[in-house]
Amino acid sequence: MGIFSIANQHIRFAVKLATAIVLALFVGFHFQLETPRWAVLTAAIVAAGPAFAAGGEPYSGAIRYRGFLRIIGTFIGCIAGLVIIIAMIRAPLLMILVCCIWAGFCTWISSLVRIENSYAWGLAGYTALIIVITIQPEPLLTPQFAVERCSEIVIGIVCAIMADLLFSPRSIKQEVDRELESLLVAQYQLMQLCIKHGDGEVVDKAWGDLVRRTTALQGMRSNLNMESSRWARANRRLKAINTLSLTLITQSCETYLIQNTRPELITDTFREFFDTPVETAQDVHKQLKRLRRVIAWTGERETPVTIYSWVAAATRYQLLKRGVISNTKINATEEEILQGEPEVKVESAERHHAMVNFWRTTLSCILGTLFWLWTGWTSGSGAMVMIAVVTSLAMRLPNPRMVAIDFIYGTLAALPLGLLYFLVIIPNTQQSMLLLCISLAVLGFFLGIEVQKRRLGSMGALASTINIIVLDNPMTFHFSQFLDSALGQIVGCVLAFTVILLVRDKSRDRTGRVLLNQFVSAAVSAMTTNVARRKENHLPALYQQLFLLMNKFPGDLPKFRLALTMIIAHQRLRDAPIPVNEDLSAFHRQMRRTADHVISARSDDKRRRYFGQLLEELKIYQEKLRIWQAPPQVTEPVHRLTGMLHKYQHALTDS
């Protein structure tokens, strides 16, 4: 595909974006808003943001959800701005500095919450800063400005949603149905690989791909949930399917690991059975029916526990899959599956990374303030706003540097594009609302196509161009003001990029170590006789951490294997029949405290000391299990866990 080519699948969204911009423009001028530009800018960003993230037309519900987050973020930012102004109106410099800290605080929170919701916090940070900077000449107009800004943004969001509904957005339901079928086949093929016990790298690639696909399916579930309330039943089933899919991966990989030491556990009956190739979900269905008969014939005791658990999870997966595809009423059997264990939420491992983001945003905003006060430049405030926007939005993404470069390219492209609109197009269309709408629709159409291609600078160019062309009521054409605004955007982006380069983020290794120690803590916490604790479902949280580890350290197989081994140990110990008595219960609490100390230790020396203490406690615990005559289902997993911790002691403790 050529650089300027237009693919058929890109046209519908481009028309949708153009319609959203035109609607916002028309409504803004019709209701005599003072700055319709904010409504147009909001409509463009809300519609184009999900398309840029998806690399194509976003699925149904994505634009609505982003609009909802933008409303929340705007209201939080407006309230924070009003509070800061009321409290510090007599100290303008202090007021701006507090706003810089507020922007950093919001970036810190956005780095810790779910990526889907982080947009609202990033927006809240720079909205307060925009209000404080804008009202500097007339602080008494703060409430009026806040209300007007909220109104304009709500109008822009409503226009984006109307355009989305007008052009029948894509439903993700068919994609979900296809992925459910394909994922079941892939799960069966992984079990075949694990029973064959072939090349370890092939198995690693297979389970790694399945972890990514299961995570992607969870993202599809979120999209389906946003799409319509009629998918509520399918959403409940998909949530349970997520846990079942992770269970299937865990049981398959444990089957592979067991054969490293005890290959005789997997009998020839099962090896021959899993030799049969499968291509479709129907093939898997037939094989599972035969497999259940084989287990009924051989007996549960003669069946390896991993295969027995895998078949049970696959059968439940099949049952819920049919329910998702048909979206029928949930029956009693499904309800029993859905009433599963409560999911556990883990503490974020990226606290140091979040603190780096806090300092990046705060320092860049303070640098912008100093630049503005030192130069006295009329567009210093515009540069400061761009600094806050770039840092607030870039920090929550995996590669902030590339986001800043995207904004720089976008603001550079916006200068000649905005110049064309400011000097030629808008003055010649000022007397005709129709011509003005057509001119902006053309801009939205072509940039909408580039946004879907994820062209570097396209998103920044769309927002920056709309921001600098005259869309105020009434329109005034001052070239010096236009040039100041355009240059202010460029300078702000360059300053933000400079701060991102200077304040290095070296938290990657620390995050990896914290994640691995959280896996260890989870495995240790599974050693308990508390019934409520044993019923907690840690699996989704553990695999979410594993997915983060895979993204932070792509290709680092030893780390992935260690994490997966800890997950397997957690699942095996969770189901182990540990003897119930006060002596063991007290020791379980002691080991959990020590594991928590390992995670929270701030220095390598403390971490090594606590880790050594944990290893000593595990040694004592094994002796206690022998005294209390614990069965092999308990002693063997504990022995394997202790061996793994001894083997990887340095990787888990050293920076």
From Swiss-Prot:
Primary localization: membrane
GO molecular function, one term: transmembrane transporter activity
A biological process term (GO) from this entry: carboxylic acid transport
Keywords: Cell inner membrane, Cell membrane, Membrane, Transmembrane, Transmembrane helix, Transport
Record carries keyword Cell membrane: yes
Locations listed in the record: Cell inner membrane
Membrane topology type: Multi-pass membrane protein
Protein name as catalogued: p-hydroxybenzoic acid efflux pump subunit AaeB
One Pfam match: FUSC
Function according to Swiss-Prot or TrEMBL: Forms an efflux pump with AaeA. Could function as a metabolic relief valve, allowing to eliminate certain compounds when they accumulate to high levels in the cell.
